[in-house]
């Protein structure tokens, strides 16, 4: 395993978290590392090194190939993308500069607004989302 330096330490730590999540999803799918690698079009030794945290999280294209090979549902796909340091699919599609998303994020991050009011704002957003996503948890 590569020895962490100040420059690589954080990336390898995130690689370990990504690897653990990847391994969990692979096992849940009942796939061997070799089968997952074949389905994703990558080398089996690369899957092994990813799972062991010996590689930095991969580029988005490889994560997307792993998601497809694992047949992950949307929530798990986003978890794997985020663990690799990528935006979830909805944010990737909308773009991180979507004005509505920025406004919501700005309000939720504004510590001048009392925590209880920010919690209520989250609840209002979740309630509004129920119209299109009935499974939305209410914070």
Question: Which residues are covered by each model-predicted region?
Answer:
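Residues in the recognition helix of alpha-helical DNA-binding motifs
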Residues: 25, 39, 50, 80-83
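A short, Lys/Arg-rich alpha-helix, primarily the initiator
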Residues: 2-29, 120
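The alpha-helix within a helix-turn-helix
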Residues: 26, 37, 67
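C-terminal regulatory/oligomerization modules of transcriptional regulators
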Residues: 108-139
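Short amphipathic recognition helices of helix-turn-helix/homeodomain-type DNA-binding modules
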Residues: 61, 74-100
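Residues within the helices of the helix-turn-helix
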Residues: 23, 34, 64
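Short, basic-rich loop-to-helix N-cap that marks the start of a DNA-contacting helix
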Residues: 54-68
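Short alpha-helical DNA-recognition segment
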Residues: 30-49
């Amino acid at each position: 395993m590569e020895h962490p330096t100040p420059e690589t330490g954080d990336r390898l730590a995130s690689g370990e978290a990504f690897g653990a999540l990847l391994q969990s999803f692979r096992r849940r799918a009942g796939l061997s590392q070799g089968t997952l690698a074949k389905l994703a079009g990558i080398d089996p030794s690369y899957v092994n090194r990813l799972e062991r945290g010996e590689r930095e999280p991969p580029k988005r294209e490889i994560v997307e190939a792993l998601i497809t090979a694992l047949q992950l549902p949307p929530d798990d796909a986003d978890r794997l993308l985020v663990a690799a340091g990528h935006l979830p699919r909805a944010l990737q599609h909308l773009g991180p500069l979507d004005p509505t998303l920025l406004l919501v994020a700005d309000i939720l991050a504004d510590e001048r607004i009392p925590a209880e009011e920010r919690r209520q704002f989250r609840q209002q957003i979740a309630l509004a989302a129920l119209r299109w996503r009935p499974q939305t948890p209410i914070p």
